[in-house]
């Protein structure tokens, strides 16, 4: 019998996860099907319950449900516990096992696929939601010179700073600030972890945040440049990357976790782009 998997989110029509996992399944000869589930806002648990009742084996979780998945799971891996968010679930009987592969996928894409070492770099992360929580500790493990979390609500960014100071192994300086506090500051790598690009909204960022030669990376993706990457391009940034590579890398981790086999390394970003 074909095993069923899916990605749940809202919106979900833009997701490339089904194409990526189908490519992985074909290359590793796995009998599985992978679809999309549009989760109702406020109805995450009911949507997952229905998928499980139909025989679903596992799900990827995307915005805005990563915190809902954290609450839904019965067994949280250390990566999910640290992040306080979940992006992959595996169903075995009444147990719901949960992982967070976002940070691992992001770091692998940036460091290995894009050949951009993060050690010693000044990093700015925009947003303080589930995506940032998932990426925070893997980014700090790369030992950047500093990491700044900027958010409209500074208190949320400060919560993540406290989390980082409690759990990080490297003594990387981590600070929180509002978006309006970024004037005059420059960074080597700027990550957009907000949902603004999904809504085609540009963030109010000063051009100065992008240091000469900076990398601009949007954790989301779409057709063409996202609103954040368009803004970066307008300020003169040429190293522009969306989250397709991160998506493919975290998908490879989830696929291996579910199926016990791994798609051939080095092909993840290519698969993501082709899909």
Q: Over which residues does each language-model region extend?
A:
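Helix N-cap at the beta1-alpha1 junction of Rossmann-like dinucleotide-binding domains, i.e.
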Residues: 12-13, 154-155, 223
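Glycine-rich adenosine-cofactor-binding loop
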Residues: 9, 98-103, 110, 114, ...
């Amino acid at each position: 019998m074909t095993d069923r998997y899916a990605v749940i989110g809202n919106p979900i029509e833009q997701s490339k996860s089904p194409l990526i996992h189908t490519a992985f399944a074909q290359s590793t000869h796995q009998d599985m099907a992978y679809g999309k589930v549009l989760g109702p806002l406020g109805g995450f648990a009911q949507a997952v319950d229905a998928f499980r009742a139909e025989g679903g084996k596992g799900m990827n979780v995307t915005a805005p449900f990563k915190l809902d998945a954290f609450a839904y799971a019965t067994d949280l891996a250390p990566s999910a516990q640290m992040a306080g968010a979940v992006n992959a679930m595996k169903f075995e009987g009444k147990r719901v096992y949960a992982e967070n592969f976002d940070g691992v996928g992001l770091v692998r894409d940036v460091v290995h696929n894009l050949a951009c070492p993060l050690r010693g770099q000044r990093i700015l992360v925009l947003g303080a939601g589930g995506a940032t929580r998932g990426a925070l500790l893997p980014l700090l493990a790369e030992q950047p010179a500093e990491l700044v979390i900027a958010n409209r609500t500074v208190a949320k960014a400060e919560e993540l700073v406290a989390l980082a100071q409690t759990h990080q192994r490297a003594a990387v300086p981590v600070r929180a600030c509002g978006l309006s506090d970024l004037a005059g500051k420059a960074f080597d790598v700027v990550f957009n972890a907000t949902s603004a690009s999904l809504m085609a909204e540009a963030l109010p960022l000063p051009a100065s945040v992008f240091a000469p030669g900076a990398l601009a990376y949007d954790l989301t993706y779409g057709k063409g440049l996202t609103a954040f990457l368009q803004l970066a391009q307008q300020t003169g940034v040429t190293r522009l990357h969306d989250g397709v590579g991160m998506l493919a890398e975290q998908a490879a981790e989830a696929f291996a976790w579910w199926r016990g086999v791994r798609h051939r390394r080095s092909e993840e970003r290519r698969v993501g782009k082709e899909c």
